[in-house]
């Protein structure tokens, strides 16, 4: 059991590690940084630093002050390939207005979840939504398999179908305490609290130091300095 849970931890770690890489005009541009600071865990100065990063990313392909999916994928995943379940899912969770683009407020609010000071419950909720592909309020076995396969593809890892199935079997054996073939939010919460390493890459330490680290870092080299 412990080996299989370790396997699931490794997959989750690879999943969230895509965030752990150099991460750092909607209409109205910056807007009200004090309001955003009150509604996120960022300070006003951190919001202002994030905005400088946002401007850089949003001008990588089309200089329109908004981040489209191609710019998002270039920045976050170092690829602009059209088919990527993993990238699509992350973008969809950032895109709370569901209009196919990210404004600065969406960008800042989503990254707030990854701040070291963000509440653990916010991190649990975000990670749960990543796997809840059908947005039904629970995670089915096939959803876990889809995301595991997508994550492995993004990270260049190769595991046999037998190993993947074994990881999923043992994960559900531990997490699905109601024995209904799915993992609801409370079961997910219990699982990740029992295995905190599942969430370790939901925290980006350098977001706490963004005012001193930006602009010395950017997502990837594709986002050129102007």
Swiss-Prot record:
Pfam family, one: EF-hand_5
Keywords: Lipoprotein, Membrane, Phosphoprotein, Repeat, Vacuole
Alphabetical list of InterPro entries matching this protein: CNBL1-10 (IPR045198), EF-hand-dom_pair (IPR011992), EF_hand_dom (IPR002048)
Expression tissues: Ubiquitous. Stronger expression in roots. Expressed in root tip and root hair zone, leaf veins, vascular bundles and vasculature of sepals.
Main location: membrane
Cell compartment(s), UniProt: Vacuole membrane
Keyword Mitochondrion in record: no
GO molecular function per UniProt: calcium ion binding; kinase binding
A Gene Ontology BP annotation from the UniProt entry: calcium-mediated signaling
Residues bearing the modification Phosphoserine: 216
GO cellular component: cytosol; membrane; plant-type vacuole; plant-type vacuole membrane; plasma membrane
Disruption phenotype: No visible phenotype when grown under normal conditions; due to partial redundancy with CLB2. Tolerant to low-K(+) stress. Clb2 and cbl3 double mutants show stunted growth, reduced fertility and necrotic lesions at leaf tips. They also have a reduced vacuolar H(+)-ATPase activity, are hypersensitive to excessive metal ions and are more tolerant to low-K(+) conditions.
UniProt KW Kinase keyword: no
Domain comment quoted from the record: The N-terminal 22 amino acids are sufficient for vacuolar membrane targeting. The internal domain (109-199) is sufficient for the interaction with MTN1.
Chain's role: Acts as a calcium sensor. CBL proteins interact with CIPK serine-threonine protein kinases. Binds calcium ions. Binding of a CBL protein to the regulatory NAF domain of a CIPK protein lead to the activation of the kinase in a calcium-dependent manner. Mediates the activation of AKT1 by CIPK proteins (CIPK6, CIPK16, and CIPK23) in response to low potassium conditions and in the context of stomatal movement. Negatively regulates the enzyme activity of MTN1 in the presence of calcium.
Sequence similarity: Belongs to the calcineurin regulatory subunit family.
Subunit structure as annotated in this protein's UniProt entry: Homodimer. Part of a K(+)-channel calcium-sensing kinase/phosphatase complex composed by a calcium sensor CBL (CBL1, CBL2, CBL3 or CBL9), a kinase CIPK (CIPK6, CIPK16 or CIPK23), a phosphatase PP2C (AIP1) and a K(+)-channel (AKT1). Interacts with PP2CA, CIPK1, CIPK2, CIPK3, CIPK4, CIPK6, CIPK7, CIPK11, CIPK12, CIPK13, CIPK14, CIPK16, CIPK23, and MTN1.
UniProt name for this protein: Calcineurin B-like protein 3
Classification of source organism: Eukaryota, Viridiplantae, Streptophyta, Embryophyta, Tracheophyta
Gene name as annotated: CBL3
């Amino acid at each position: 059991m412990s080996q299989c849970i370790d396997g699931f931890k490794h997959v989750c770690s690879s999943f969230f590690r895509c965030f752990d890489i150099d991460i750092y005009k909607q209409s109205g541009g910056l807007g009200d940084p004090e309001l955003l600071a009150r509604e996120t865990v960022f300070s006003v100065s951190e919001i202002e630093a994030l905005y400088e990063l946002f401007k850089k990313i949003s001008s990588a392909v089309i200089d329109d002050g908004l981040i489209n999916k191609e710019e998002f994928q270039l920045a976050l995943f170092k690829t602009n390939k059209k088919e990527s379940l993993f990238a699509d899912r992350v973008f969809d969770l950032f895109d709370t207005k569901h209009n196919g683009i990210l404004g600065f407020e969406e960008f800042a609010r989503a990254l707030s979840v990854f701040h070291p000071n963000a509440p653990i419950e916010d991190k649990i909720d975000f990670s749960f939504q990543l796997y809840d592909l059908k947005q039904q309020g629970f995670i089915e076995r096939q959803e876990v398999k889809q995301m595991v396969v997508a994550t492995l593809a993004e990270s260049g890892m190769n595991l046999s179908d037998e190993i993947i199935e074994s990881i999923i079997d043992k994960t559900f054996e531990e997490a699905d305490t109601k024995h209904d073939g799915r993992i609801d939010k409370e079961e997910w919460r219990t699982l990740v609290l029992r295995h905190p390493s599942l969430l370790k890459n939901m925290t980006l330490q350098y977001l706490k130091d963004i005012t001193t680290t930006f602009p010395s870092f950017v997502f990837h080299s594709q986002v050129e300095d102007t």
